């Protein structure tokens, strides 16, 4: 029980911080944190909640299938399946899914992936070589959630990672809440920088193709 309260507090603090950045517009987004490994349980945001508010109903505890462990009227977030795929296939401890203007714009510039390179902040992703290059996959935003989940699952390759969904934000996961938040901040910085650079250069260039 102590672990549950500790993780609840941790997830609540992350929600507050990301809310101050307006990364949960119009009740969008969802975040989760692992509570136990065997059996697998995790806390996830309840569906349709105003994330600028803090209430006792912000999160609910679900199992490895995303089904509530305790009787509740709350519904887990619509994209819970993405979280279950991550936790069932990795040792990740935290998953963050947010909608920002920048990450949505990026998915309209590129088709299957965006490639970013030679930025110091890439080291926040535990990539240390000089002039490092990263590739972030982009998948289609299928309305059929099982199809979305299956396409997403194909890109889960480790205990940390990120996947962009076209016009539907980014999902980032990490070893724990600190790692996941650090990675999310790094990706959002890279997207903002890339878009600003393209605007200064006079438009889409360097391999980017308008996908809208």
UniProtKB/Swiss-Prot annotation:
Asked whether the keyword Transport is assigned, the reply is: no
Entry's SMART domains?
Answer: Aldolase_II
Q: Which InterPro entries match?
A: Aldolase_II/adducin_N, Aldolase_II/adducin_N_sf, MethylthioRu-1-P_deHdtase_MtnB
List the cofactors. Answer: Zn(2+)
Q: How is the cofactor bound?
A: Binds 1 zinc ion per subunit.
Which catalytic reaction applies to this protein?
5-(methylsulfanyl)-D-ribulose 1-phosphate = 5-methylsulfanyl-2,3-dioxopentyl phosphate + H2O
Alphabetical GO CC annotations of the entry are: cytoplasm
Pfam families, alphabetized: Aldolase_II (PF00596)
- Give the enzyme's EC designation: 4.2.1.109
Question: Part of which pathway?
Answer: Amino-acid biosynthesis; L-methionine biosynthesis via salvage pathway; L-methionine from S-methyl-5-thio-alpha-D-ribose 1-phosphate: step 2/6
Enzyme class, one word? lyase
Q: Which key words are in the record? A: Amino-acid biosynthesis, Lyase, Metal-binding, Methionine biosynthesis, Zinc
GO BP, sorted A to Z: L-methionine salvage from methylthioadenosine
Recorded GO MF terms:
methylthioribulose 1-phosphate dehydratase activity; zinc ion binding
Residues the record lists as binding Zn(2+): 97, 99
Q: Which family does it belong to?
A: Belongs to the aldolase class II family. MtnB subfamily.
Function, as annotated, reads: Catalyzes the dehydration of methylthioribulose-1-phosphate (MTRu-1-P) into 2,3-diketo-5-methylthiopentyl-1-phosphate (DK-MTP-1-P).
Assembly mode: Homotetramer.
Please report the name of this protein according to its UniProt entry.
Methylthioribulose-1-phosphate dehydratase
Protein species of origin: Bacillus anthracis
């Amino acid at each position: 029980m102590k672990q549950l309260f500790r993780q609840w507090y941790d997830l609540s603090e992350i929600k507050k911080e990301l809310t101050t950045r307006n990364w949960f517009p119009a009740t969008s987004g969802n975040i989760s944190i692992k509570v136990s490994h065997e059996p697998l349980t995790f806390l996830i945001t309840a569906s349709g909640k105003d994330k600028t508010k803090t209430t006792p109903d912000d999160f609910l505890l679900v199992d490895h299938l995303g089904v509530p462990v305790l009787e509740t009227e709350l519904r887990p977030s619509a994209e819970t399946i993405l979280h279950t795929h991550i936790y069932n296939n990795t040792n990740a401890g935290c998953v963050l899914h947010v909608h920002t203007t920048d990450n949505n714009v990026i998915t309209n510039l590129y088709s299957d992936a965006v490639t970013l390179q030679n930025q110091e902040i890439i080291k926040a992703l535990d990539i240390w070589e000089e002039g490092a290059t990263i590739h972030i996959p982009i998948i289609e935003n299928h309305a059929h959630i099982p199809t979305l989940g299956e396409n997403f699952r194909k890109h889960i390759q480790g205990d940390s990672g990120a996947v962009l969904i076209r016009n539907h934000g980014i999902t980032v996961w990490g070893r724990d809440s600190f790692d996941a938040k650090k990675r999310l901040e790094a990706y959002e910085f890279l997207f903002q920088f890339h878009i600003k650079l393209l605007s200064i250069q006079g438009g889409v260039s360097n391999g980017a193709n308008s996908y809208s």
